[in-house]
């Protein structure tokens, strides 16, 4: 029974826990949902609810005055917001991903999901965001159960084939330019490469301990094989002193004799006849 409940946890078959809150961290029913919303007490992911206010909030592609908006200006507005939020959250620790929803439903519009590398960094950011405002609006932040965005995002939206539009219950992640992504997240790759080079130049204390243990194990194996507790370096010095030979107990080096040539049948018969004559003469 326990295995069955664990296998259906967070799925449509689970009649106790809300699958949408488990996968997306948001549910269109909110607190009125008939299923449980298990809010995590600690998580590497924070949800900043309805934080991004797009310039075409009322009608996509049109400003509040009813004038059409240039798509490039909408993208610039979004990337300015994205960079601003990233730089602020990056103060608390390494940010692995930052996703902003492009959905239009009330429970998902403008939602910002930030996944930190460490849970402690997320907790520090959550503490610092309490009571703060952005663009004149209070920041509503909380831990989110979402840690794998592959299960939360709409695959049809990524393929430009979602027929639910902005009211889809899965995340429509708004994309940033490649240049901005390289600028923001590339710093971690550069710092990692620098750290790798510095680590390659010097051996860490842990590696030193492992190296010394390996050398000790090698010495024990040498003593077991050769006795006298001699190390391989001592044997190599003796090997060089003796001229590289393999002499043992002072015995001279033997030279191999050439192989005996097998006798023919006529030679054997002649030798046997000679033995018989010598035997008869002796008698």
Curated annotation (Swiss-Prot):
Keywords: DNA-binding, Metal-binding, mRNA processing, mRNA splicing, Nucleus, Repeat, RNA-binding, Spliceosome, Zinc, Zinc-finger. Pfam families: RRM_1, zf-CCCH. A zinc finger (C3H1-type) spans 12-40, 148-175. InterPro entries: Nucleotide-bd_a/b_plait_sf, RBD_domain_sf, RRM_dom, RRM_dom_euk, U2AF_small, Znf_CCCH. GO terms for cellular component: nuclear speck; nucleus; spliceosomal complex; U2AF complex. Residues 191-283 are annotated as: Disordered. SUPFAM superfamilies: RNA-binding domain, RBD. GO terms for molecular function: DNA binding; RNA binding; zinc ion binding. Necessary for the splicing of pre-mRNA. Probably active at the 3' splice sites. This is Splicing factor U2af small subunit B. It comes from Arabidopsis thaliana. The gene is U2AF35B.
């Amino acid at each position: 029974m326990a295995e069955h409940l664990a296998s259906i946890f967070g799925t449509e078959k689970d009649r106790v826990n809300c699958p949408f809150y488990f996968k997306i961290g948001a549910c269109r029913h909110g607190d009125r949902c008939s299923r449980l919303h298990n809010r995590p007490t600690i998580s590497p992911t924070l949800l900043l609810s309805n934080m991004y206010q797009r310039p075409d909030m009322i009608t996509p592609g049109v400003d509040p005055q009813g004038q059409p908006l240039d798509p490039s200006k909408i993208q610039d507005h979004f990337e300015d917001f994205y960079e601003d939020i990233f730089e602020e959250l990056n103060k608390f620790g390494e940010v692995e991903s930052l996703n902003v929803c492009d959905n239009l439903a009330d429970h998902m519009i403008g939602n910002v999901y930030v996944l930190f590398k460490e849970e402690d960094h997320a907790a520090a950011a959550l503490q610092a965001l309490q009571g703060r405002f952005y663009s004149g609006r209070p920041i509503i932040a909380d831990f989110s159960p979402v840690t794998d965005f592959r299960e939360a995002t709409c695959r049809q939206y990524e393929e430009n084939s979602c027929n639910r539009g902005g009211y889809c219950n899965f995340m429509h992640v708004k994309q940033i330019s490649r240049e901005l992504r390289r600028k923001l997240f590339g710093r971690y790759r550069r710092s990692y490469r620098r750290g790798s080079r510095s680590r390659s130049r010097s051996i860490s204390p842990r590696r030193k301990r492992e190296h010394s243990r390996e050398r000790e194990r090698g010495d024990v194996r040498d003593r077991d094989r050769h006795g006298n507790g001699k190390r391989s370096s001592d044997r190599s010095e003796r090997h060089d002193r003796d001229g590289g030979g393999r002499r043992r107990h002072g015995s001279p080096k033997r030279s191999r004799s050439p192989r005996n040539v097998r006798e023919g049948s006529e030679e054997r018969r002649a030798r046997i006849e000679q033995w018989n004559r010598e035997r008869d003469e002796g008698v």
